[in-house]
Amino acid sequence: MGNFQKEYGESELIDTYLNIAVAETLKELRKEYNYSYSELANKLTKKVSRQTLNNYELGKSKLRMDMFMEFAKVYHLTPKELYEKINMKYISKLSQYTEEITKKEK
């Protein structure tokens, strides 16, 4: 993750880690439920392409609130539960980044 610091400013770096946390959480949930992109797309009430789902999981597309609610519903989670999963991943990513910086400063 050290390369992000070269490419982004500090405020954008925080946003980048949040985007990574969202992407990884969505990918983990899809795999946990053994859904292909096509199966997941069929379960969502809002029509999205497999490519859009892939972009969410790669962090190339930011998740809008309506899609956040859709994913929570498909994975049988309350919005709060999905938020907490993402938040835990985000905290983990920031902790890793902080450890990297601390090691470099020593």
What label would you give each PLM region?
Residues 1, 66-81:
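DNA major-groove recognition helix of helix-turn-helix/homeodomain DNA-binding modules
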Residues 2-33:
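A short, Lys/Arg-rich alpha-helix, primarily the initiator
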Residues 7-8, 13-16, 73, 83-106:
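Short, charged recognition helix plus adjacent turn
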Residues 26, 40-41, 53-56, 82:
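Conserved hydrophobic/aromatic packing and binding residues within compact polymer-binding modules
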